[in-house]
């Protein structure tokens, strides 16, 4: 028989629950609030068959465009050929979670605001742009208790 091309084909490991995360779904999953414009990650929960997105969208990040009682509409851009296609996927809340992709940026914004406020109080200017890491500073290596060792490759020998 030819193999199946079903909607859940080849998802044996993709839709697995995590280690020590089997059983009842946590109540916190249902208590999270989603608003239009929130950035969410789609992570399929194999224990809930209702409102499950297609396997392509598992692991994708999108923006919430619609909120209902038990599900959210997520806007995702899919690469098709040489273009991005806008896809609107309706997913139950068991299969989405808030994304942490902007967390680093938001933390940096808060830190920059604190630096700016402190500098303004002192009457100084502050550099808020990120700078690339400079090269290591020049230094001398002492050979007093650190004798140089010459390394040679080991000759290849066939053993039968």
From Swiss-Prot:
Alphabetical list of SUPFAM superfamilies matching this protein:
Translation proteins SH3-like domain
Give the matching Pfam families.
Answer: Ribosomal_L21e (PF01157)
Q: Name one GO molecular function term.
A: structural constituent of ribosome
Localisation per UniProt entry = Cytoplasm
Q: What is its main location?
A: cytoplasm
Kindly state which keywords UniProt assigns to this record, in alphabetical order.
Cytoplasm, Ribonucleoprotein, Ribosomal protein
Q: Which GO terms describe its cellular component?
A: cytosol; cytosolic large ribosomal subunit; preribosome
UniProt keyword Ribonucleoprotein, yes or no:
yes
Provide the residue span(s) of the region labelled Disordered: 114-140
Against InterPro entries, the record matches this protein to: Ribosomal_eL21, Ribosomal_eL21_CS, Ribosomal_eL21_sf, Translation_prot_SH3-like_sf
In which domain of life is the source organism classified? Eukaryota
**UniProt record, GO biological process:** cytoplasmic translation
Q: Which PANTHER family match?
A: 60S RIBOSOMAL PROTEIN L21
Tell me the subunit arrangement: Component of the large ribosomal subunit (LSU). Mature yeast ribosomes consist of a small (40S) and a large (60S) subunit. The 40S small subunit contains 1 molecule of ribosomal RNA (18S rRNA) and at least 33 different proteins. The large 60S subunit contains 3 rRNA molecules (25S, 5.8S and 5S rRNA) and at least 46 different proteins.
Described by its record, this protein's role is as follows: Component of the ribosome, a large ribonucleoprotein complex responsible for the synthesis of proteins in the cell. The small ribosomal subunit (SSU) binds messenger RNAs (mRNAs) and translates the encoded message by selecting cognate aminoacyl-transfer RNA (tRNA) molecules. The large subunit (LSU) contains the ribosomal catalytic site termed the peptidyl transferase center (PTC), which catalyzes the formation of peptide bonds, thereby polymerizing the amino acids delivered by tRNAs into a polypeptide chain.
Additional comment: There are 2 genes for eL21 in S.pombe.
Similarity section = Belongs to the eukaryotic ribosomal protein eL21 family.
What is the name attached to this protein's record?
Answer: Large ribosomal subunit protein eL21B
Source species: Schizosaccharomyces pombe (strain 972 / ATCC 24843) (Fission yeast)
User: Lineage of the source organism?
Assistant: Eukaryota, Fungi, Dikarya, Ascomycota, Taphrinomycotina
């Amino acid at each position: 028989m030819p193999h199946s091309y079903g909607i859940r084909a080849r998802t044996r490991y993709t839709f697995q629950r995590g280690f020590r995360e089997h059983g009842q779904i946590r109540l916190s999953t249902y208590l999270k609030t989603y608003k239009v414009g929130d950035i969410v990650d789609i992570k399929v929960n194999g224990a809930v068959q209702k409102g499950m997105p297609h396997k392509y969208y598992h692991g994708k990040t999108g923006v919430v465009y619609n909120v209902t009682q038990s599900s959210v509409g997520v806007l995702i851009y899919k690469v098709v050929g040489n273009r991005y296609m806008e896809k609107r996927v309706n997913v139950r809340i068991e299969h989405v979670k808030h994304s942490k992709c902007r967390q680093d940026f938001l933390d940096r914004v808060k830190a920059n605001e604190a630096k700016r406020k402190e500098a303004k109080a002192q009457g100084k200017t502050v550099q808020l742009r990120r700078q690339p890491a400079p090269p290591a500073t020049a230094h001398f290596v002492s050979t007093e208790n650190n004798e140089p060792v010459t390394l040679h490759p080991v000759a290849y020998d066939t053993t039968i």
